[in-house]
């Protein structure tokens, strides 16, 4: 920091030479780009120069104030400018803005300065002096002229003028010296003139500043001392009483600081604070203050001596780096004193304020309007209030100040108006009385500005005519001491006169010895004595003073006013103040008179300097003591000693440095000249060095330097250009060579690409030719093209398929030769012809012709009297007869509804009539179709003797005698009786075995298949099915294996060759086959199946059959369904309401099945239904709780109204029960058929529904029980409520209505829940249908379709192989879309729309209604909204399992199988009641009760019951034997030491692997096998091995080949075989039995010895009962 007094750099203060050197340094640093933000030294120098500039200006204003008047000849222009200044600068200010304000800190009137009751400093900060109306000023120089003092010279600015100002000051000083040389004005004027003369070279080079004083300059701590060094060489501040208010008259333009624009009555003695800034009181800082970093004057080039030109000149911005002031300085809130109230114009059109005003965001406070202040503040404004704004019209009229009239009148005062006055001519000089009064007022003013703040009584008597006490009261000796006016508590809105009028031209009041002029207070302050209040001047209205309405006359002020005293400032404080009004604006005003005395910053600075000096002295004393040899601390390190010694010596250099600075500063003024003392021309005038020349020299040097650099740069650039040109030539040459190489390479690549393209075209052309040959069944052409192509893969594939077909051909021959021919008279061939060897010509025949070598024309039999067969039915009869003639079996796979039953009856009647084959014929049908078969036989072949083998045991016993006598042609029975009464039925040698719905034997391991294949004998076998391929090729092979066991004897080879093209449609092994390979394999498969499979579609044979249109409708989930679905999906369980109101947890098994239930209807769970509808009376909840039911609520009324009969198929009988409740609530008649419906009732239900007069429009059926063999063609609408995993079940259900005899278009509506498990089920079913389409339908097994038709159909399926959606996916449908979907005609569409409008008008549910149609989440109970943590669910699930097992309600079991024999007996027996069948696999019973007992049945009975009769020692041995095998497999490790039993201990998790339990029907694991061993579940080793093999097969089926589980299973299977061989080799089982027998005999001996000691009630059981005898004691247990 640069200090002025006591500073190390300037020990004797700032001299003109110091200032010149600082300015030169400032100029150099500014040219180098230094700013105050990034250069602290530059900021310090700028602050010092700014401070000196303020001092110059303040001294100049002080000299003007000390002069009496301006000379008339020199200052006429100045007064003219003063008079016209307001109209020039502020004529366009808006109303209410601050105009000319009298600065605080000096009196603004001729009245007395009232003493301050608080701190005696009311003249310093009292705002009453700011707000004075129009009182004449005692400092008014034109009115207080002294003839002894010469007029002051006319000056513009001490820095902007040249020698003119200094000469004027010298003349002025000489005039003063002639009168009185002791006049201080003389010395001041002479010093200022000398300073200006010596500093004239700083005329136009002084650093530019802004015309504002800085609010705070934080870079200069010590700005000005009490005085400068000397009157001659330094700038000295006069030794006057401190004034903490800057004395700048803002009644003139605050932006024009020309000396002639400043009134002569303004005291410009400015006291600078210690920090170099003008003290600012934050409570009185006005919004009109200039931005931080501004300065008072702007002495830069172009400055003119008129306010208008300066106002329109552009001032430097506060952010300009070339200005030597701190642009980032903040308001010095710590400084005491008043502030600079600057007016800020708002109308920028007249003065172009944009050029010099900064943003108002820098202002610390907003503008404060006069009318916003409380009434008490308008007359006496405290220091906390903002400077009042000024009205522009008030400023306009303020240039003509009203005068105080010498003869006041109270009535006249009320009518006076503020009228602008004309120019006032200069008055005469001051007389002696006026001069004495002026001197007294000056003394009083200085006393008030002193620290004491008290005016001596003599001065008060001279000024006021009386003496005031300390409490602001008149002394008792004065006659008017009791007439002190008081503030009134009554607030009024009377406007007050503007307190900022210029008073320089007010008339002087004479001859008032005992009175003083006081300022006029607002009318809101009444006085107690009306006589004393009369002389007060009444304030003028604001609108009159502005001059907006009319020009008023000049105000006449009273000449004789009796002022008593100032108002006690305590009257402005209301006591007490309520707490609610404590923070109001009128109670927050600060009264400066009541504030404590202000702080003297000079004393603070002096104290700070003393403290610093004392600190330095104490530190020196401490360091000296520390470095004394005797007091040295041994613990102090040598490094610390060195530091302390260095510090001590630095502190001792302080005085020497100060002395050196003083010496240097005293020498600097003498070394300023360029001339030297020893030169000859030292006394000649030396040219003064100016900054312009220095700048010019620097510019020339810089120019030369720049030119030299440019020449060097040009030389370097020329050299670089030559290098670059050479480089460019080289690069061009190389690029040309590279382009040539590249072109050659491209030509070669293009040549090879062309060759490759031609070869590819040739290969594609060859492939197309092969495909054409393949599609045309031209095998010779295909083989020839294949030889040319040399495709080894296709060749190998073709060879393999040829070999397979050759083997099949040979197998066909064997099959034909093995079947007993019987009587084949007529056109058929004899057995000798069949046994003839195959010739070379026969080898070249078609595979189909080989199978059907014998052909016979057929006609309708005569005994077939029910009607006439159609052409396609005769074709079917011909194909079945061809199989019979060629000793082959087959599959009649016509689509449902084409009359397979009638064709079969016709075939039987043909054999009876034409072939004389009387049977017996065995027809195995489902129970649901048995009645239909009987009816068809009675209709079409009544002469055929038939037996319906069914009913209770008594009825079947009567039928058995007829069977034994063979008095029948056809036996009709069901699958259950085939198994149940196998001993009887298997004894008969059947001629033909016909199985309806033959897909029941698709599993070769099933009990039905094994029973038929093992025990039943027939010459011919025929399968009737509408869906030969339901899931995969192995199921198709199972059917082929059953009818042709000699041909299709290997499932492995069949699946290996023909399942490859379908592996990429969802299987795990994906082998890439091109179109040709897939087509070749599929064609070979069709070629294999065509002789044995006969299939026609309804659309092919029945051209007049109406179409079947299927639509998939996606239904949304209700709020209840959504919550339950999320719970089940996330936690695998449902949350139900507990008994005590808490949320309970209900665990469920088979997550997929539970999700399907939720999608169908949530009320399938009784707990949920009780929670939602406790009373069970809210019928609307039945359809609002489920999306599917809500959709049906909109569809069914429309269908019933238009007469459309509807079939609705369900998977779950519980949903059918809920649907019954819904239909009953709507009073709609319905029929129901499921697995529990009796056989006799089914016929009556069908007849009732098919009756045209019936009023039943809806028939509910279960898919498995009612989807087979029923004729319901009177219905034209089928609704699939929930999709079956097997799509053919749904197709069977659809064909109940879409069949022969249907005359209407059939609409199939499939309901799918949106975004649920049902979408996955549908996609899986669609995949199965695609597989069926490729294998069966594309084969066109109708013996009449052309190869082109079959090829086109297959190709269309292959093209859409990747499609998942097809044309069946629809989103959620609105009413209009739904109407278009279910309507058949336009009339129905109009009717449906009308019904929708009626429902919307009457329904209480829907959009815009209180409740939605679907149940929302907000309507659910609270416990459904609780989010249960999964950890809590998991921990509590184990505790709830046992309780839920006991409390689980009994539900009706859903049976997808036919009724067993016992159930049928019970059904047929009216005296018995049908008991619900238990879940799980039915227990096997012995045939002991049956009269027909075969050895096989006896063996089975003994084998099953022999486990418990097995001796105990054998069971122990077997248990030990099985456990040893188990331990060997359990402890098996792989080659890397890993136990292979990890994934075989327990079955997979149902939640993680739900599809495992769909694919794997019998899961088993090592844990279950171990439990079976311990519980003696195995009767022999074979059962144990069977369980192990089942576990291995499950692993092979579910997992991919070469996977870890697959390989582990192979290793365990291999180990099992080795263990078995090892144990059998050692005969371990026999050895274990002997050991167990010996142990048992030993125990028996022990028991015989201890038998006498046993008590009678020891629990011995007689051995005669063949029971286990058990003896128990405290130590052991023995069993026999």
Curated annotation (Swiss-Prot):
<feature type="domain" description="QLQ">
    <location>
        <begin position="429"/>
        <end position="465"/>
    </location>
</feature>
<dbReference type="GO" id="GO:0003677">
    <property type="term" value="F:DNA binding"/>
</dbReference>
<dbReference type="Pfam" id="PF14619">
    <property type="entry name" value="SnAC"/>
</dbReference>
<feature type="region of interest" description="Disordered">
    <location>
        <begin position="817"/>
        <end position="836"/>
    </location>
</feature>
<feature type="compositionally biased region" description="Basic residues">
    <location>
        <begin position="1476"/>
        <end position="1486"/>
    </location>
</feature>
<feature type="compositionally biased region" description="Low complexity">
    <location>
        <begin position="282"/>
        <end position="299"/>
    </location>
</feature>
<dbReference type="GO" id="GO:0006357">
    <property type="term" value="P:regulation of transcription by RNA polymerase II"/>
</dbReference>
<dbReference type="Pfam" id="PF00439">
    <property type="entry name" value="Bromodomain"/>
</dbReference>
<feature type="compositionally biased region" description="Polar residues">
    <location>
        <begin position="234"/>
        <end position="245"/>
    </location>
</feature>
<keyword id="KW-0378">Hydrolase</keyword>
<keyword id="KW-0156">Chromatin regulator</keyword>
<dbReference type="GO" id="GO:0016887">
    <property type="term" value="F:ATP hydrolysis activity"/>
</dbReference>
<keyword id="KW-0804">Transcription</keyword>
<dbReference type="GO" id="GO:0003682">
    <property type="term" value="F:chromatin binding"/>
</dbReference>
<comment type="function">
    <text>Helicase. Component of the SWI/SNF complex, an ATP-dependent chromatin remodeling complex, required for the positive and negative regulation of gene expression of a large number of genes. It changes chromatin structure by altering DNA-histone contacts within a nucleosome, leading eventually to a change in nucleosome position, thus facilitating or repressing binding of gene-specific transcription factors.</text>
</comment>
<dbReference type="InterPro" id="IPR049730">
    <property type="entry name" value="SNF2/RAD54-like_C"/>
</dbReference>
<dbReference type="Pfam" id="PF00271">
    <property type="entry name" value="Helicase_C"/>
</dbReference>
<feature type="region of interest" description="Disordered">
    <location>
        <begin position="61"/>
        <end position="135"/>
    </location>
</feature>
<dbReference type="Pfam" id="PF00176">
    <property type="entry name" value="SNF2-rel_dom"/>
</dbReference>
<dbReference type="GO" id="GO:0005634">
    <property type="term" value="C:nucleus"/>
</dbReference>
<feature type="region of interest" description="Disordered">
    <location>
        <begin position="367"/>
        <end position="427"/>
    </location>
</feature>
<feature type="region of interest" description="Disordered">
    <location>
        <begin position="477"/>
        <end position="499"/>
    </location>
</feature>
<dbReference type="InterPro" id="IPR000330">
    <property type="entry name" value="SNF2_N"/>
</dbReference>
<dbReference type="GO" id="GO:0006338">
    <property type="term" value="P:chromatin remodeling"/>
</dbReference>
<dbReference type="InterPro" id="IPR001487">
    <property type="entry name" value="Bromodomain"/>
</dbReference>
<feature type="compositionally biased region" description="Polar residues">
    <location>
        <begin position="406"/>
        <end position="419"/>
    </location>
</feature>
<keyword id="KW-0103">Bromodomain</keyword>
<dbReference type="GO" id="GO:0140750">
    <property type="term" value="F:nucleosome array spacer activity"/>
</dbReference>
<dbReference type="GO" id="GO:0042393">
    <property type="term" value="F:histone binding"/>
</dbReference>
<dbReference type="GO" id="GO:0072686">
    <property type="term" value="C:mitotic spindle"/>
</dbReference>
<comment type="subunit">
    <text>Component of the SWI/SNF global transcription activator complex composed of at least arp9, arp42, snf5, snf22, snf30, sbf59, sol1, ssr1, ssr2, ssr3, ssr4 and tfg3.</text>
</comment>
<protein>
    <recommendedName>
        <fullName>SWI/SNF chromatin-remodeling complex subunit snf22</fullName>
        <ecNumber>3.6.4.-</ecNumber>
    </recommendedName>
</protein>
<keyword id="KW-0347">Helicase</keyword>
<dbReference type="GO" id="GO:0045815">
    <property type="term" value="P:transcription initiation-coupled chromatin remodeling"/>
</dbReference>
<feature type="region of interest" description="Disordered">
    <location>
        <begin position="203"/>
        <end position="258"/>
    </location>
</feature>
<comment type="similarity">
    <text>Belongs to the SNF2/RAD54 helicase family.</text>
</comment>
<keyword id="KW-0067">ATP-binding</keyword>
<keyword id="KW-0539">Nucleus</keyword>
<feature type="domain" description="Helicase C-terminal">
    <location>
        <begin position="1191"/>
        <end position="1354"/>
    </location>
</feature>
<dbReference type="InterPro" id="IPR027417">
    <property type="entry name" value="P-loop_NTPase"/>
</dbReference>
<feature type="compositionally biased region" description="Polar residues">
    <location>
        <begin position="817"/>
        <end position="832"/>
    </location>
</feature>
<feature type="compositionally biased region" description="Polar residues">
    <location>
        <begin position="477"/>
        <end position="489"/>
    </location>
</feature>
């Amino acid at each position: 920091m640069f200090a002025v007094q006591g500073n190390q750099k300037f020990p004797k203060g700032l001299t003109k030479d110091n200032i010149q050197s600082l300015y030169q340094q400032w100029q150099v640093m500014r040219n180098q780009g230094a700013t105050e933000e990034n250069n602290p030294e530059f900021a310090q120098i700028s602050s010092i120069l700014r401070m000196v500039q303020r001092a110059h200006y303040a001294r100049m204003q002080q000299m003007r104030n000390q002069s009496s008047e301006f000379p008339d000849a020199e200052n006429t222009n100045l007064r003219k400018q003063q008079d016209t200044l307001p109209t020039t600068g502020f004529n366009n200010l808006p109303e209410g803005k601050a105009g000319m304000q009298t600065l605080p800190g000096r009196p603004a009137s001729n009245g007395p300065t009232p003493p301050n009751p608080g701190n005696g400093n009311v003249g310093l900060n009292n705002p009453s002096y700011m707000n004075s109306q129009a009182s004449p000023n005692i400092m008014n120089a034109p009115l207080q002229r002294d003839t002894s003092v010469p007029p002051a010279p006319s000056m513009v600015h001490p820095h902007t003028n040249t020698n003119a100002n200094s000469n004027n000051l010298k003349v002025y000083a000489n005039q003063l010296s002639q009168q009185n040389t002791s006049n201080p004005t003389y010395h001041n004027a002479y010093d200022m003139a000398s300073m200006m003369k010596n500093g004239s070279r700083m005329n136009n080079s002084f650093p530019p500043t802004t015309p504002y004083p800085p609010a705070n300059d934080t870079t200069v701590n010590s700005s000005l001392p009490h005085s400068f060094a000397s009157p001659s060489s330094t700038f000295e501040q006069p030794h006057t009483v401190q004034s903490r208010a800057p004395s700048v008259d803002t009644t003139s333009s605050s932006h024009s600081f020309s000396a002639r624009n400043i009134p002569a009555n303004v005291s410009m003695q400015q006291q600078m604070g210690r920090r170099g800034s003008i003290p600012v009181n934050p409570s009185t800082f006005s919004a009109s203050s200039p931005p931080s970093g501004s300065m008072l004057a702007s002495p830069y080039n172009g400055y003119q001596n008129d306010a208008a030109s300066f106002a329109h000149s552009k001032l430097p911005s506060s952010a300009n780096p070339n200005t030597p002031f701190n642009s980032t300085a903040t308001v010095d809130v710590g400084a005491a004193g008043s502030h600079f109230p600057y007016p800020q114009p708002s109308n920028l059109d007249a003065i172009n304020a944009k050029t010099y005003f900064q943003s108002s965001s820098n202002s610390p406070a907003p503008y404060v309007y006069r009318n916003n202040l409380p009434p008490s503040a308008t007359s006496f404004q405290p220091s906390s209030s903002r400077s009042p704004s000024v009205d522009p019209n008030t400023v306009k009229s303020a240039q003509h100040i009203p005068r105080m009239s010498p003869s006041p009148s109270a009535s006249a005062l009320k009518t006076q108006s503020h009228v602008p006055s004309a120019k006032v001519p200069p008055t005469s000089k001051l007389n002696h009385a006026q001069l004495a009064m002026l001197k007294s007022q000056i003394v009083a003013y200085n006393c008030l500005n002193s620290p004491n703040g008290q005016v001596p009584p003599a001065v008060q008597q001279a000024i006021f005519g009386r003496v005031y006490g300390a409490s602001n009261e008149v002394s008792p000796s004065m006659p008017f001491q009791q007439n002190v006016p008081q503030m009134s508590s009554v607030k009024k809105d009377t406007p007050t006169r503007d307190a900022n009028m210029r008073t320089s031209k007010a008339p002087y009041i004479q001859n008032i010895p005992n009175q003083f002029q006081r300022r006029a207070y607002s009318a809101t302050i009444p006085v107690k004595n009306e006589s004393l209040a009369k002389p007060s001047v009444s304030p003028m209205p604001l609108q009159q003073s502005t001059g907006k309405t009319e020009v008023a006359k000049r105000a006449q002020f009273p000449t004789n006013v009796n002022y008593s005293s100032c108002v006690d400032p305590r009257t402005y404080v209301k006591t007490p103040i309520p707490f609610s009004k404590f923070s109001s604006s009128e109670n927050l005003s600060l009264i400066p008179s009541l504030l404590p005395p202000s702080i003297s910053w000079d004393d603070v600075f002096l104290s700070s300097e003393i403290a610093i000096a004392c600190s330095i002295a104490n530190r020196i004393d401490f360091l000296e003591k520390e470095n004394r040899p005797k007091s040295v601390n041994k613990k102090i390190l040598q490094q610390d000693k060195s530091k302390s010694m260095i510090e001590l010596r630095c502190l001792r250099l302080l005085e020497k440095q100060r002395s050196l600075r003083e010496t240097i500063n005293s020498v600097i003024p003498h070394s300023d000249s360029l001339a030297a003392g020893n030169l000859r021309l030292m006394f000649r005038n030396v040219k003064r060095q100016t900054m312009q020349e220095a700048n010019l020299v620097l510019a020339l040097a810089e120019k030369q330097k720049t030119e030299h650099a440019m020449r060097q740069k040009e030389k370097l650039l020329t050299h670089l250009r030559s290098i670059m040109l050479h480089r460019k030539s080289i690069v061009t040459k190389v690029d040309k060579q590279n382009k040539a190489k590249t072109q050659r390479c491209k030509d070669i690549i293009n040549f090879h690409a062309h060759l490759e393209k031609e070869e590819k075209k040739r290969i594609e052309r060859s492939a197309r030719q092969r495909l054409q040959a393949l599609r045309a069944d031209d095998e010779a052409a295909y083989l020839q093209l294949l030889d040319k192509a040399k495709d080894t893969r296709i060749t190998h594939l073709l060879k393999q398929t040829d070999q397979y077909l050759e083997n099949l051909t040979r197998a066909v021959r064997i099959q034909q030769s093995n079947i007993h021919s019987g009587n084949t008279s007529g056109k058929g061939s004899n057995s000798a012809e069949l046994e003839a060897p195959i010739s070379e010509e026969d080898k070249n025949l078609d595979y189909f012709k080989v199978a059907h070598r014998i052909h016979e024309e057929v006609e309708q039999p005569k005994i077939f009297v029910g009607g006439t067969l159609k052409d396609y039915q005769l074709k079917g009869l011909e194909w079945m007869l061809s199989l019979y003639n060629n000793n082959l079996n087959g599959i009649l796979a016509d689509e449902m509804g084409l009359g397979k039953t009638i064709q079969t009856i016709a075939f039987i009647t043909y054999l009876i009539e034409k072939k004389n084959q009387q049977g017996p014929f065995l027809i195995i049908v489902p129970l649901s179709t048995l009645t239909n078969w009987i009816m068809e036989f009675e209709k079409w072949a009544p002469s055929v003797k038939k037996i319906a083998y069914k009913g209770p045991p008594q009825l079947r016993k009567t039928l058995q005698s007829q069977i034994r006598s063979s008095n029948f042609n056809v036996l009709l029975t069901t699958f259950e009786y085939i198994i149940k009464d196998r001993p009887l039925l298997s004894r008969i040698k059947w001629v033909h075995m016909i199985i309806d719905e033959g897909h029941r034997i698709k599993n070769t391991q099933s009990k039905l298949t094994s029973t038929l294949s093992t025990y039943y004998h027939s010459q011919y076998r025929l399968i009737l099915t509408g869906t030969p391929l339901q899931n995969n090729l192995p199921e198709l092979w199972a059917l082929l294996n059953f009818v042709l066991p000699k041909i299709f004897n290997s499932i492995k080879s069949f699946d290996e060759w023909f399942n490859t093209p379908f592996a990429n449609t969802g299987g795990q092994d994906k082998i890439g086959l091109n179109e040709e390979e897939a087509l070749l394999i599929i064609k070979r498969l069709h070629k294999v199946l065509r002789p044995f499979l006969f299939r026609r579609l309804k659309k092919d044979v029945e051209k007049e059959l109406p179409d079947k249109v299927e639509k998939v409708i996606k239904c949304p989930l209700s709020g209840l369904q959504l919550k339950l679905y999320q719970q089940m999906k996330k936690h695998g369980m449902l949350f139900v309401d507990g008994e005590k109101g808490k949320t309970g947890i209900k665990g469920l098994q088979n997550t997929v099945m539970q999700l399907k239930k939720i999608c169908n209807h949530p009320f399938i769970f009784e707990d949920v239904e009780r929670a939602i509808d406790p009373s069970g009376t809210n019928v609307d909840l039945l359809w609002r709780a489920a999306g599917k039911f809500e959709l049906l609520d909109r569809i069914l009324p429309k269908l019933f109204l238009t007469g459309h009969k509807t079939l609705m198929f369900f998977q779950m009988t519980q949903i059918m029960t809920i649907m019954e409740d819904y239909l009953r609530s709507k009073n709609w008649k319905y029929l129901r058929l499921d697995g529990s419906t009796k056989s006799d009732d089914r016929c009556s239900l069908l007849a009732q529904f098919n009756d045209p007069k019936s009023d039943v429009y809806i028939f509910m059926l279960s898919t498995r029980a009612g989807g087979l063999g029923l004729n319901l063609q009177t219905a034209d609408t089928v609704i699939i409520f929930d999709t079956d995993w097997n799509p053919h079940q749904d197709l069977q259900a659809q064909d109940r209505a879409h069949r022969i005899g249907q005359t209407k278009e059939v609409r199939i509506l499939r309901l799918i829940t949106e975004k649920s498990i049902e979408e996955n089920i549908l996609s899986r079913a669609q995949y199965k249908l695609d597989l069926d389409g490729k294998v069966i339908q594309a084969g066109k097994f109708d013996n009449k379709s052309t190869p082109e038709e079959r090829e086109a159909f297959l190709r269309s399926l292959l093209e859409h192989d990747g499609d998942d959606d097809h044309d069946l996916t629809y989103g959620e449908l609105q009413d209009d879309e739904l109407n278009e979907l279910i309507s058949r005609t336009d009339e129905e569409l109009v009717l449906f729309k009308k019904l929708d409008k009626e429902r919307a008008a009457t329904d209480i549910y829907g959009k815009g209604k209180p409740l939605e149609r679907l149940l929302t989440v907000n309507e659910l109970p609270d416990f459904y909204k609780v989010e249960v943590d999964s950890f809590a669910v998991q921990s509590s699930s184990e505790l709830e399992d046992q309780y839920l097992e006991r409390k689980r309600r009994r539900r009706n079991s859903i049976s997808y199988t036919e009724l067993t024999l016992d159930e049928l007996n019970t059904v047929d027996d009216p005296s018995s009641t049908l008991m619900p069948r238990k879940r799980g696999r039915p227990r096997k019973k012995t045939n002991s009760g049956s009269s027909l007992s075969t050895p096989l049945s006896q063996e089975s009975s003994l084998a099953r019951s022999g486990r418990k009769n097995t001796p105990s020692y054998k069971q122990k041995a077997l248990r030990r034997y099985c456990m040893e095998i188990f331990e060997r497999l359990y402890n098996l490790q792989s080659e890397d030491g890993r136990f292979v039993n990890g994934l075989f201990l327990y079955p997979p998790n149902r939640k993680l692997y739900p599809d495992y339990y769909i694919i794997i029907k019998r899961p088993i694991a090592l844990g279950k096998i171990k439990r079976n061993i311990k519980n003696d579940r195995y009767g022999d080793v074979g059962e144990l091995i069977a369980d192990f093999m089942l576990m291995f097969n499950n692993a092979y089926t579910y997992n991919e080949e070469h996977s870890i589980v697959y390989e582990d299973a192979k290793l365990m299977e291999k180990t099992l075989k080795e263990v078995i061989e090892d144990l059998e080799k050692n005969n371990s089982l026999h050895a274990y039995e002997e050991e167990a027998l010996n142990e048992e005999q030993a125990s028996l001996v022990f028991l015989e010895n201890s038998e006498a000691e046993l008590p009678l009630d020891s629990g011995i059981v007689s051995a005669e009962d063949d029971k286990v005898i058990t003896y128990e004691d405290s130590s052991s247990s023995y069993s026999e």
